[in-house]
């Protein structure tokens, strides 16, 4: 957990490459992805230390089969630089190629998406708002209106993502409730919950 947000967080003694990658997605910025690729490919353990406190043991990053224990939760990371575009159109779930048309527009504008939850009549596209500069947001909006013709289109600003990561989440009954309940108790509404197929992150 970011010590700037939580006082005296527990140190992470050990994590897997996969856990590190999941945490880095939501702001756990320690390594550049390409910089550690040779270590991952060679299954070489990495030790991360605090330059201000080099006497501390630091965090070991190891292959999954070398981890000495699997924490229920290894780390929590967050990022707040997201926006979402919400589209509503009757029976979009039956329209072949609907999502592909939107992705083509985004590709033309060199915009990638983070998540795309959908329903029977609606679709939400969550984007890194750092991509929506230099008029791209306006161009994306106009092209979707012209080419997709949604019944409703809305921008929803200031989304945050909280990433909870741990190898111990795999197949653990009640993991989702343990994470969601404190958020509910804090009076925070959830827009979307997503657990990847690897099950190590929520």
Residue ranges with predicted function:
Residues 1-202:
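C-terminal catalytic "cap/lid" subdomain
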């Amino acid at each position: 957990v970011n010590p700037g947000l939580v006082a005296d967080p527990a140190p992470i003694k050990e994590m897997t490459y996969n856990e590190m990658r999941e945490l880095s997605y939501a702001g756990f910025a320690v390594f550049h992805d390409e910089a550690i690729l040779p270590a991952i490919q060679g299954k070489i353990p990495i030790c991360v230390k605090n330059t201000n406190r080099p006497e501390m043991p630091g965090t070991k990053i190891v292959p999954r089969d070398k981890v000495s224990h699997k924490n229920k939760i290894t780390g929590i990371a967050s990022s707040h630089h997201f926006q979402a575009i919400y589209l509503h159109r009757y029976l979009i779930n039956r329209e072949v190629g609907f999502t592909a048309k939107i992705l083509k527009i985004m590709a033309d504008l060199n915009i990638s998406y983070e998540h795309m939850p959908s329903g029977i009549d609606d679709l939400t596209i969550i984007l890194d708002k750092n991509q929506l500069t230099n008029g791209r947001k306006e161009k994306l909006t106009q092209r979707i209106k012209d080419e997709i013709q949604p019944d409703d289109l809305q921008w929803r600003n200031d989304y945050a993502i909280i990433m909870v990561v741990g190898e111990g989440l795999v197949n653990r009954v009640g993991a989702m409730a343990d994470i969601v309940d404190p958020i509910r108790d804090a009076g925070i509404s959830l827009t979307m919950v997503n657990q990847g197929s690897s099950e190590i992150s929520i």
